[in-house]
């Protein structure tokens, strides 16, 4: 689905901006890529709004927390483990996702 008149597509499971995955679900992990551009950050914020508008409030709150943590920590990725209910800001998500 096109995201609010911009060059990004999304579903509840992913967000793609200019052919770059910014958010996706890998098994029981949510992964957010804080790509270093204002446009990508704007697309993440629009994605959070889209989730709220589509009655995915709990999901939107998780992504919002991931976004805030990523901006604060200045790391490239934020990973959320659904099973452990744990957030981690990392430079390379592959070390966290097992």
Language model feature labels by segment:
Residues 1-98:
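Terminal leader/tail segments of proteins
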């Amino acid at each position: 689905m096109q995201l609010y008149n911009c060059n990004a597509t999304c579903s509840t499971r992913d967000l793609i901006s200019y052919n770059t995955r910014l958010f996706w679900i890998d098994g029981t992990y949510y992964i957010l890529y804080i790509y270093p551009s204002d446009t990508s950050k704007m697309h993440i914020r629009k994605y959070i709004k889209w989730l709220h508008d589509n009655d995915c409030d709990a999901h939107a709150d998780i992504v919002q927390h991931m976004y805030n943590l990523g901006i604060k920590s200045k790391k490239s990725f934020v990973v959320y483990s659904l099973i452990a209910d744990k957030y981690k800001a990392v430079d390379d998500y592959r070390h966290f996702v097992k």
